[in-house]
Amino acid sequence: MGRAGGGGPGRGPPPLLLFLGAALVLASGAVPAREAGSAVEAEELVKGSPAWEPPANDTREEAGPPAAGEDEASWTAPGGELAGPEEVLQESAAVTGTAWLEADSPGLGGVTAEAGSGDAQALPATLQAPHEVLGQSIMPPAIPEATEASGPPSPTPGDKLSPASELPKESPLEVWLNLGGSTPDPQGPELTYPFQGTLEPQPASDIIDIDYFEGLDGEGRGADLGSFPGSPGTSENHPDTEGETPSWSLLDLYDDFTPFDESDFYPTTSFYDDLDEEEEEEEDDKDAVGGGDLEDENELLVPTGKPGLGPGTGQPTSRWHAVPPQHTLGSVPGSSIALRPRPGEPGRDLASSENGTECRSGFVRHNGSCRSVCDLFPSYCHNGGQCYLVENIGAFCRCNTQDYIWHKGMRCESIITDFQVMCVAVGSAALVLLLLFMMTVFFAKKLYLLKTENTKLRRTNKFRTPSELHNDNFSLSTIAEGSHPNVRKLCNTPRTSSPHARALAHYDNVICQDDPSAPHKIQEVLKSCLKEEESFNIQNSMSPKLEGGKGDQADLDVNCLQNNLT
């Protein structure tokens, strides 16, 4: 192969010459391509070619048109030698790692090659713009070192392309591919077309840069890594260890891992603040403990490998299962905190059970030991209350007592102030006074009604006429109305038929029939009535007086007799 050796050892092809070479390739019409060689040959080619670097003050004239006797596809090197497009492409491909292919050739639509990744990467079907080629030639990429050499590549029948009329000679071009992975194409992924012919399988590197697999065999490859890129059973090239990150993402290895949830292993702060909600959690804890073995019921698994997979399988070595929070609090061995059992439950007041995870009433498990609630939570009792531990009850709060201030509640959370007490006292006193006032008004009204009725009766009796008084059935004066009473002086005297004496007929008959000595008694009674006339005030006040002021003696006798007999 012809090389430009006119330059010094520290000088390389200028960018202008590379630009001219790219223009010649575009004008050539068809360029054959070969399969990618090994990385060792690419490295040797780069080492064999002179590394030219133009000095800062180097100035060159623009290349003029070729002479009439020279080849159209050749160009003049700085040393004066002619160099064809083959040498230009070889050196530019060795420096920049870019494959110069023609998309418009009849037998080649695009090349699909593996550049050190598990996914197929498509080479650009169209050549890049000249300014892009110029930028890539200025920045030489790092050539990875290959750890294994292979023989010279052999072309395939499908690689041969039709010759072009513009080129005077038909010599194949070597296309060098960078197996270490170059910078991604800024134009994005393009459509790939099947390559005519199969690429020769290239051996992969012996080093697998994966820290998540164990049990590799002596050759440095996993026995069952056929599904991963670069495994022995495939024709894909394995990525180089010193190259960039391969295109297949390492996140695929984490598909079998469960993300860590901190809430599954550590209780929240509400567990310490809202102790009033412990009963519901205690019921769940009781069901979990009383149901038997936790590992059998809830399938609590420790971090172990997959069942049935031994060393050398290339699978993840561990799998985490999230533990429910209700089992981590006081039921799983080694947990940080245990719930306080409900007071009075049988079997829960023991110092510790067989697994040593339960505590007595009023104690909780903290950092592997049972501690008192009063010591663990200094503010368990609110408003200055004192915390005590009572057997079979648990934590008990004794509320603080102050002047005109009282506290109540299980944890002294309620406050009663002096204002509230004053309101209650004043309200009670007002209620009692209201009841007394209502009773006083009620009885006063009753007395007033009685007094008013008596006054009306007195006024009515004062203005009554004598005729109304004589007709009154309750008046004793009706008997002695204006005539002598028909009262016999003696029992043997005949009766008179006077109608005025009918009222005394009954008494007359009684006296005369019952007692034979009745006449003598009647006489004595009449005498006594005359003597004691002044003592009968009631009879005198109720008896009518005659207009002349003279009362009949007989009437007085009758009245006296009537009073004594009755």
Curated annotation (Swiss-Prot):
The modification Phosphoserine is found at residues 467, 475, 483, 543. Detected in cerebrospinal fluid (at protein level). Detected in urine (at protein level). Expressed in brain (at protein level). N-glycosylated. Residues 31-423 are extracellular. Keywords: Cell membrane, Developmental protein, Differentiation, Disulfide bond, EGF-like domain, Endoplasmic reticulum, Glycoprotein, Golgi apparatus, Growth regulation, Membrane, Neurogenesis, Phosphoprotein, Proteoglycan, Secreted, Signal, Synapse, Transmembrane, Transmembrane helix. It comes from the Eukaryota. It is a single-pass type I membrane protein. Residues 445-566 are cytoplasmic. Glycans are attached at residues 38, 57, 117, 165. The chain crosses the membrane at residues 424-444. Different forms of various molecular weight have been observed. Such forms are possibly due to different levels of glycosylation, phosphorylation and/or protein cleavage. This is Chondroitin sulfate proteoglycan 5. It comes from Homo sapiens (Human).
